[in-house]
């Protein structure tokens, strides 16, 4: 039977205490590429969470039958299969968003968070805990993505979900959109500020020299 304390730890821990982006600095590439809009950040969060959760579940389910010499290949095959399913669903039901995300959905297979949880946790833990660990890490990744996407879209174009929130000067409003926020380097600075803020609140996360 699943340990409720362990499930709570693996589900909530990655949100703040062990965030895969803020603490482990994983999954940075997609965090830069898909956060120009809040909508794409949310969809990418859902996609990564589903792939991480179900890949961890299936890998945990067969962990005792995977030879150590080919475990990485098996893990990648399972992850790749799930990524293809997610990509096909997006193309079928959310084609415009799928086009905006471009190759980055397919590149979920190379996301260190997905592979890392499969190797570090799913290969050593029961299926239910592994599934919840996948959800927790996917949501931890998503929290940063959504925050970055929120700030970049709001200050870069004055919109959220494509809806004008702050009317631009060109349209008779007061806000002058800052195009810098729509460039990839801005995501680096925002993520850096989020990491700084989190480690200020939680000094234990600061690396010791």
UniProtKB/Swiss-Prot annotation:
Group of enzyme by EC: translocase
Top-level taxon: Bacteria
TM stretches of this protein: 42-62, 72-92, 103-123, 131-151, 178-198
Enzyme Commission numbers on file: 7.2.1.1
Gene Ontology molecular function terms on file: oxidoreductase activity, acting on NAD(P)H, quinone or similar compound as acceptor
Keywords annotated in UniProt: Cell inner membrane, Cell membrane, Ion transport, Membrane, NAD, Sodium, Sodium transport, Translocase, Transmembrane, Transmembrane helix, Transport, Ubiquinone
Stored InterPro entries: NqrD, NqrDE/RnfAE
GO biological process terms on file: sodium ion transport
HAMAP family: NqrD
Entry function: NQR complex catalyzes the reduction of ubiquinone-1 to ubiquinol by two successive reactions, coupled with the transport of Na(+) ions from the cytoplasm to the periplasm. NqrA to NqrE are probably involved in the second step, the conversion of ubisemiquinone to ubiquinol.
PANTHER family xrefs: ELECTRON TRANSPORT COMPLEX PROTEIN RNFE, NA(+)-TRANSLOCATING NADH-QUINONE REDUCTASE SUBUNIT D
Assembly notes: Composed of six subunits; NqrA, NqrB, NqrC, NqrD, NqrE and NqrF.
Family: Belongs to the NqrDE/RnfAE family.
Protein name: Na(+)-translocating NADH-quinone reductase subunit D
């Amino acid at each position: 039977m699943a340990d409720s304390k362990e499930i709570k730890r693996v589900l909530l821990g990655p949100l703040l205490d062990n965030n895969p982006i803020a603490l482990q600095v994983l999954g940075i590439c997609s965090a830069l590429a898909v956060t120009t809009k809040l909508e794409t950040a949310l969809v990418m969060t859902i996609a990564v969470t589903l792939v991480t959760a179900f890949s961890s579940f299936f890998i945990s389910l067969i962990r005792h039958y995977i030879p150590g010499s080919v475990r990485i290949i098996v893990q990648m095959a399972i992850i790749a299969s799930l990524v293809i399913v997610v990509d096909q669903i997006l193309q079928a039901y959310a084609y415009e968003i799928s086009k905006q995300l471009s190759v980055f959905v397919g590149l979920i297979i190379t996301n260190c968070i997905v592979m890392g949880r499969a190797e570090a946790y799913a290969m050593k833990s029961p299926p239910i805990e592994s599934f919840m660990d996948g959800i927790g890490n996917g949501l931890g990744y998503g929290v940063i993505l959504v925050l970055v996407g929120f700030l970049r879209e709001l200050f870069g174009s004055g919109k959220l979900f494509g809806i004008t929130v702050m009317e631009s000067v060109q349209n008779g409003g007061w806000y002058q959109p800052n195009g810098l926020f729509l460039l990839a380097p801005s995501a680096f600075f925002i993520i850096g500020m989020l990491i700084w803020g989190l480690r200020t609140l939680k000094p234990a996360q600061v690396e010791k020299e």
